[in-house]
Regions:
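Recognition helix of helix-turn-helix/homeodomain-like DNA-binding domains
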Residues: 29-44
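DNA major-groove recognition helix of helix-turn-helix/homeodomain DNA-binding modules
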Residues: 48-63
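Short glycine/serine/threonine/alanine-rich loop segments
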Residues: 19, 30, 59
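Short acidic DE-rich linear segments
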Residues: 68-71
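A short, Lys/Arg-rich alpha-helix, primarily the initiator
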Residues: 1-17
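Short alpha-helical "recognition helix" segments of helix-turn-helix
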Residues: 24-25
Length: 71
């Protein structure tokens, strides 16, 4: 089980950074529409097989986010 809601976290981080989904998409080499599909859970971020493997091994997945310092 993934204990984070990655899609919601992405939306929140966009808002905190004052970045649109279009800008985020361009920053990672994709489109704002694709970012929107991820946020709306139409396309998953995490590979389902990876999650199943970790669950079979007895693990939950917990992600942490650490803001990098701008140099």
């Amino acid at each position: 089980m993934i204990r984070n809601d990655i899609e919601i976290d992405t939306k929140i981080k966009c808002l905190e950074a004052k970045m649109t989904q279009q800008q985020l998409g361009e920053a990672v080499g994709t489109t704002g529409q694709y970012v929107n599909r991820i946020i709306k859970k139409k396309d998953g971020v995490v590979n389902k097989t990876f999650v199943q493997m970790m669950e079979a091994l007895g693990y939950d997945i917990v992600l942490t986010y650490e803001k990098r310092e701008v140099k």
